[in-house]
Regions:
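ATP-binding N-lobe of GHMP and related small-molecule kinases
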Residues: 1-114, 118-134, 139-143, 148, ...
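C-terminal nucleotide
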Residues: 2-13, 38-72, 168-288
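Hydrophobic side chains within alpha-helical segments
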Residues: 22, 160-161, 198, 263
Length: 288
């Protein structure tokens, strides 16, 4: 009973080009989509947050003074993490009743988790009468996923949700955390995202293993005397010089990062001039 004080809509995102590049300090090209997460919230008189998630028909409740992780409830941990880190950042987060709904397929690769995190952040900030810089909120939501969900994600997903604009892709530099908006809306084309129905969880998809392999490759390249702080700074020449040290698997990982960054640069230029045919070829190359 009763009406919400605030309703927040937080979009999902799709990454056009730039897979496995965000945590390697490279360039990525995501865009926000028209599906997302809706969060209705109102203040309570106590220190509890009571949540209902429509998509999974689950309830969760926690005390703001003792916010911890729970087992076997991913969505609960995303919201718990955001609430805890907002409080740690000095926001006076109030008790709240929260209802979560949306039309993003969970585990479909459209950043349902980042959408939920960012939406929760904005809803709790609104209830607290507080504001936060968009980049800072994106970083806080990323940390919530690291600390409460145990997923070592890069920043791209939260960043794309926070900075996304209709009809624009985001060319994001994951090293400097700056971005440019790239027009990608044209009456002659439509972006179609198909749900394969194959569930995907970052925590169990080999994502963490691949991230460790990239970290290992960077350590080897640095040990060989190359002054780089991320794989995003590695050139093709540097990769060729280190192939023997890296071995086949790590060489493949680094080559993907180097060539993928090139595709983001080229692809954003193609989008800017409306050459969707050439952009499409780069998408095929990216997914090989």
């Amino acid at each position: 009973a009763g009406r919400p004080e605030f309703v927040v809509h937080s979009p999902g995102r799709v990454n056009l080009i730039g897979e496995h590049v965000d945590y390697n300090g490279g360039l990525v090209l995501p865009m926000a989509i028209d599906r997302g997460t809706a969060i209705a919230a109102r203040r309570r008189d106590d220190r509890k947050v009571v949540m209902w998630a429509e998509a999974v028909a689950q309830q969760d409740a926690f005390d703001l003074d003792r916010t911890g992780r729970v087992n076997k409830c991913d969505w609960c941990n995303y919201v718990r993490g955001v609430a805890a880190l907002l409080a740690r950042a000095g926001v006076d987060v109030p008790g709240a009743d929260v209802v979560i709904a949306g039309d993003l397929p969970i585990g479909g690769g459209l950043s349902s988790s980042a959408s939920l995190e960012v939406g929760s952040g904005y809803a709790l900030l609104a209830l607290a009468g507080a504001e936060m810089d968009r980049l800072r909120l994106a970083q806080l939501c990323q940390q919530a996923e690291h600390q409460f969900a145990g997923v070592p994600c890069g920043l791209m997903d939260q960043y794309a949700v926070v900075f996304g604009r209709a009809g624009q892709a985001i060319r994001m530099d994951c090293r400097t955390l700056a971005h440019q908006l790239v027009p990608c809306d044209h009456e002659a084309i439509a972006w179609v995202v198909l749900d394969s129905k194959a569930p995907r969880k970052l925590g169990a998809s080999g994502y963490a293993r691949r991230r460790k392999e990239c970290d290992k490759a960077l350590a080897i390249i640095r040990k060989a005397g190359h002054d780089v702080t991320s794989l995003g700074e590695v050139t093709l020449e540097t990769l060729l010089a280190c192939e023997d040290r890296l071995g086949e698997t790590l060489t493949r990982r680094v080559r993907h990062v180097v060539t993928e960054i090139g595709r983001v640069v080229e692809g954003s230029d193609y989008l800017s001039i409306g050459r969707y045919d050439l952009f499409g070829r780069l998408m095929y190359a990216s997914h090989r």
